[in-house]
Amino acid sequence: MERKKMQNDKSFLGKEPVGRLLFQLAIPTVMAQIINMLYNVVDRIYIGHIPGSGALALTGVGVCMPIILIVSAFASMVGSGGAPRATIAMGKNEEDQAEQILGNCVTLQLIISVILTTVLLTFGRQILLAFGASENTIEYACAYLNIYAIGTIFVQLTLGMNTFITAQGFAKIGMLSVLIGAVANIVLDPIFIFKFGMGVRGAGLATVISQAMSCTWVMAFLLGKKTYLRIKRRNMRLKKNVVVPTLTLGLAAFIMQSSESIISVCFNSSLLRYGGDLAVGAMTILTSVMQFAMLPLQGLGQGAQPIISYNYGAHNAKRVKETFGLLVKVNLCYSIILWLCVQLFPGTFVSMFTSDAQLLTFGKSALRIYMAVMFVFGIQVACQLTFSALGNAKASIMVAVMRKFILLIPLIYLLPHLFAKNPLMAVYLAEPVADTLSVIFASTLFAFQFKKAVREMEGE
């Protein structure tokens, strides 16, 4: 495709009505995120129902979650740092620069994959023990992680490079990237876990095969002729002026996801102290439900990101403001509906992951506390993703650091001492307290930074 034609094709991001455009991009992306949620939790759903050992196996795989989050965080750092910069370059009609960013990001993902796989295969058992595995759960955790580690390269390329597909406006293609792997995982899981009797090893193998299928789809598209930005060998040589800004912008996304890993370790250690394996197992369920809550919000933000980034690059302040306003409204509506469902029907969510009566009863009470202020969290997600879409790395990092490191981690250890009569539930209470304070901070910071960005666009 000729460069001039490419420019005309992508100009819809600056011309189509914002409302219609947002939903055209967001609905497939949200569907992809929901499918991705099933992709991530389907292992836990099947594992939790393994006869005789489901509860312990679920807890063991739950201990692997901090590691899986770190792997995803590296992919997100490269993808979330590179994709907005590439879209901004497209808005400025600088396709050569955009393809340079794309090529460098592929190389970064390959390098990161080799390093992560080596570390996990060499030190996996020691890491799991440090992350909260007990004598009862360590073998289940190792069985899953040893197989998952082999497929790290597929995770990196699928999650990291799929953002470049969505960022160009190919939301349906991005959705299919996730759908292919999700359907494969849902089909393969019961076959490997139950029919072949592989247990948690089967779940890990199903995940690796599914990710490989998604990876093949993503890379085939970005190497093909239908994409605006194409992977080319000459652009894969790392350049400092591309790598440093990309990783700097993606650092906020990395902090958000890797901090989830650190937080998971903190939760597990504190819960193991006050409630044993039962409390850690419940946390596996709570984080799975939280994934369900967060991924559609992330999908909406990813649908809005190309519109905001493109029009920011084109200095169209009106469309940027209109897109953000609509994003906040939709996020709030979704958050409120989900909050009501969790508070009214917690057992529906918990029973998806376990048939153990004790874990089911405990999990319902913990879930209500853990997601007590979910109804306002859509505001922070909208601010966070808009900061990234505008290329404001500093503000994105500030929001990420505030919620995770300054608020939540200290509260995990502080609240059990303040509520000594029920320290176990006080651990779960740390999440809603941190959410409330971080939403206030993110909204205040965004009010100042967004006005500044609008003035810059209007001043050009």
List PLM regions with ranges.
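Small-residue hotspots at the loop-to-helix junctions and early N-terminal turns
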Residues: A55-P66, A141, L145, G204, ...
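Short runs within selected transmembrane alpha-helices of multi-pass transporters and secretion channels
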Residues: G79, Y148-T166, S177-A182, A203-T216, ...
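Small-residue-rich hydrophobic transmembrane alpha-helices
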Residues: L58-T118, V155-G174, A282-L340, L344-P346, ...
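Residue-level signal for transmembrane alpha-helical positions in Major Facilitator Superfamily
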Residues: F23, L38-Y39, V78, V119-F123, ...
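Helix-terminus/linker motif at the lipid-water interface of multi-pass membrane proteins
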Residues: I34, L38-L58, L128-E135, I191-M198, ...
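Transmembrane helical elements of multi-pass membrane transporters/channels
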Residues: Q24-D43, I147, G181, S210-S214, ...
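Short alpha-helical transmembrane segments in multi-pass integral membrane proteins
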Residues: M1-T29, A86-G151, K195-G250, I308-V373, ...
